[in-house]
Curated annotation (Swiss-Prot):
UniProt xrefs under Pfam families: HHH_5, RuvA_C, RuvA_N
Taxonomic path: Bacteria, Pseudomonadati, Pseudomonadota, Gammaproteobacteria, Vibrionales
Organism: Aliivibrio fischeri (strain ATCC 700601 / ES114)
Name of the protein described by the UniProt record: Holliday junction branch migration complex subunit RuvA
Domain description: Has three domains with a flexible linker between the domains II and III and assumes an 'L' shape. Domain III is highly mobile and contacts RuvB.
Subunit description: Homotetramer. Forms an RuvA(8)-RuvB(12)-Holliday junction (HJ) complex. HJ DNA is sandwiched between 2 RuvA tetramers; dsDNA enters through RuvA and exits via RuvB. An RuvB hexamer assembles on each DNA strand where it exits the tetramer. Each RuvB hexamer is contacted by two RuvA subunits (via domain III) on 2 adjacent RuvB subunits; this complex drives branch migration. In the full resolvosome a probable DNA-RuvA(4)-RuvB(12)-RuvC(2) complex forms which resolves the HJ.
Any one biological process term the GO annotation gives: DNA repair
Length: 207
């Protein structure tokens, strides 16, 4: 079981990163709400991981804190919600927003997430509302992600078309349909926007 990685951050290709630990490179998928808080490429990073073994693959999902990982594990306990959908849910909104939506039984907001239909949204509310009651909201998310302005994403691709392409690819990887991803990014894109900003603003607009 791989629960924590500490090493050199080699690549950032949202929503995936590559981190080198003792000469071994680990590919890790991370919710965008956590991805925004990663240090620059070349810096040391500490990532808490959830390890998934399937017949055809071994996958790592990464988080900045143990509590973010704990919330992810609660989300994927819900009937019909696997790691891929859990990743999309916690990319489409911050952990605090998700908890608030569940507590308020806000089905209309939850169904805007990729892969979440009305039945899945209702299951999330029914199955998670009681489980989340004992959690303090401040323990469920990285404060900087939910409350503070993001950095400028200077280590991300800055060429206008490359930034657009990377943003579209990231949204598709999170479960959005190609046409929806392309249309949303195109509507938001400006010449000076980095791919990180494009991804973040696109996700906001779809929620």
């Amino acid at each position: 079981m791989i629960g924590r990685l500490r090493g050199n951050l080699l690549e950032k290709q949202p929503p995936e990163l590559l981190i080198e630990v003792s000469g071994i490179g680990y590919e890790v998928q991370m919710p965008m709400s956590c991805f925004y808080e990663l240090p620059e490429v070349g810096s040391e990073a500490i990532i808490y991981t959830h390890y998934v073994v399937r017949e055809d693959a071994q996958l790592l999902y990464g988080f900045n804190t143990k509590n973010e990982r704990a919330l992810f594990r609660e989300v994927i306990k819900a009937n019909g919600v696997g790691p891929k959908l859990g990743l999309a849910i916690l990319s489409g909104m911050t952990a605090a927003q998700f908890v608030q939506s569940v507590e308020r039984e806000d089905i209309s907001t939850l169904v805007k997430l990729p892969g979440v239909g009305k039945k899945t949204a209702e299951r999330l509310v029914v199955e998670m509302k009681d489980r989340l009651k004992g959690w303090g909201a401040g323990d469920l998310f990285t404060p900087a992600t939910d409350a503070a302005p993001m950095d400028d994403g200077s280590e991300f691709i800055t060429s206008p078309q490359s930034a657009v392409d990377e943003a579209v690819s990231a949204l598709i990887a999170l479960g959005y349909k190609p046409q929806q991803a392309s249309k949303t990014v195109s509507q938001i894109a400006k010449p000076d926007m980095t791919s990180e900003v494009l991804i973040r603003e696109s996700l906001k607009s779809m929620i």
